[in-house]
Amino acid sequence: MITSQLLHPASIVVVGASNNVHKPGGAILKNLLSGGYTGELRAVNPKETEVQGVAAFADVKDIPDTDLAILAIPAALCPDAVEMLAAEKQVKAFIILSAGFGEETHEGAVLEDRILETVNRYGASLIGPNCIGFMNSWHHSVFSQPIPQLHPQGVDLISSSGATAVFILESAVTKGLQFNSVWSVGNAKQIGVEDVLQYMDEHFDAENDSRIKLLYIESIGDPDRLLFHASSLIRKGCKIAAIKSGSSESGSRAASSHTGAIASSDSAVEALFRKAGIVRCYSREEL
């Protein structure tokens, strides 16, 4: 579920905000500030009254109602925070940067399940967990660098891997490539690559939307939906290029260790991409 509060939030809270810009909670707040976000910005940090010039609250229960919550706190604390924010603070979008979920342990997977049940019950979006975030021209909710030039006619990048997204951004920035949006879906507990493509297809604006989509996929949860919406976007004039990681046995293990993903066979991926009209790339440099 992709809500308007994820794409165009009028207010954002960073839970676990920090004055240390080398921590995710500090880096993402810095990027929001330097990116010129014009909405209401709040921080939650029990040890500070102000973080990077932003008013800080001791607990999530103390903040005003907010559209988007970014969580940079230990995984074990996330389910209760999400419940409070969704139930009491009307939050309709969550970005969870934290690792330590289903990509690591069974206990972590249980935490993810609790979070998913909560966000679905309250009709909220969830990016992550275990991701670098999301950005568009409205807000730079990522903890990584670089921040590329953002333009409605730029490229849409959807990546299962935050590290790969950063690598692609670093390469693209040196070439002057502009972006419309960057989606780091991480463990993709609610929103995966297929969901983003579906949203882009169903809301496609031929006059204003980007026509170039770059995908880095670690698992394909719903091949039929990916095929349908990729094919539809291509018929509308879009170009889609993609890497499917983990096609080899060693690559499958790497993909699984990163996101808890189960990789698809190489022959199935090849057939799917060919049928959809997706240009398959075999390296990040090629993409």
Q: Where are these predicted regions, by residue range?
A:
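Catalytic-core regions of core metabolic enzymes
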Residues: 1-286
